[in-house]
């Protein structure tokens, strides 16, 4: 009876070692779970970014207002008969506002 008990105990020790430290054990399981959680967070950020870009694409494809707004803001384009004015603050005011932003 003693040999059978020792054999079963040895098998139990080996199974416990495999469970905790072996390939695909508890340590690997927790590491993979952490990797999956990090990847899901990254995927959520990228999905939000993609949704925003698709919304902008739909807006650009469907509406003239978005095209006109981008043309005016980014390319400084105007309609015939319009005059484009860009208001630039004085250098002293720009320095003051930059100094306040750094505080």
Swiss-Prot record:
* Role this protein plays: Essential cell division protein. May link together the upstream cell division proteins, which are predominantly cytoplasmic, with the downstream cell division proteins, which are predominantly periplasmic.
Organism per entry = Escherichia coli (strain K12)
Give TM regions: 4-21
Q: Return the NCBIfam families for the record.
A: PRK00888.1 (NF002058)
Instruction: Please give the residue ranges for the topological domain Cytoplasmic.
Output: 1-3
Protein name from the UniProt record: Cell division protein FtsB
Misc. comment: The C-terminal domain of FtsB is degraded in the absence of either FtsL or FtsQ.
Q: Which family does it belong to?
A: Belongs to the FtsB family.
Q: How does the record say this protein sits in the membrane?
A: Single-pass type II membrane protein
Give GO BP annotations, semicolon-separated.
Answer: cell division; division septum assembly; FtsZ-dependent cytokinesis
Task: Show the GO cellular component annotation of the record.
Answer: cell division site; cell septum; divisome complex; FtsBL complex; FtsQBL complex; plasma membrane
Molecular function, one GO term: identical protein binding
Q: Which InterPro entries match?
A: Cell_div_FtsB, FtsL/DivIC
PANTHER family cross-referenced by the UniProt entry = CELL DIVISION PROTEIN FTSB (PTHR37485:SF1)
- Give the knockout phenotype: Mutants form long filaments, but DNA segregation is not affected.
Give the domain section of the comments.
The transmembrane segment and the membrane-proximal periplasmic region, which forms a coiled-coil structure, are required for interaction with FtsL and recruitment of downstream division proteins. The C-terminal region is required for interaction with FtsQ, but is not required for recruitment of the downstream division protein FtsI. Contains a leucine zipper-like (LZ) motif, which is required for optimal interaction with FtsL.
Q: Quote the subcellular location field of this record.
A: Cell inner membrane
Query: How is this protein organized at the quaternary level?
Result: Part of a complex composed of FtsB, FtsL and FtsQ. The complex can be formed before its localization to the division site. This tripartite complex can be divided further into a subcomplex of FtsB and FtsL, which forms in the absence of FtsQ. Also interacts with FtsI and FtsN.
Provide the taxonomic classification. Answer: Bacteria, Pseudomonadati, Pseudomonadota, Gammaproteobacteria, Enterobacterales
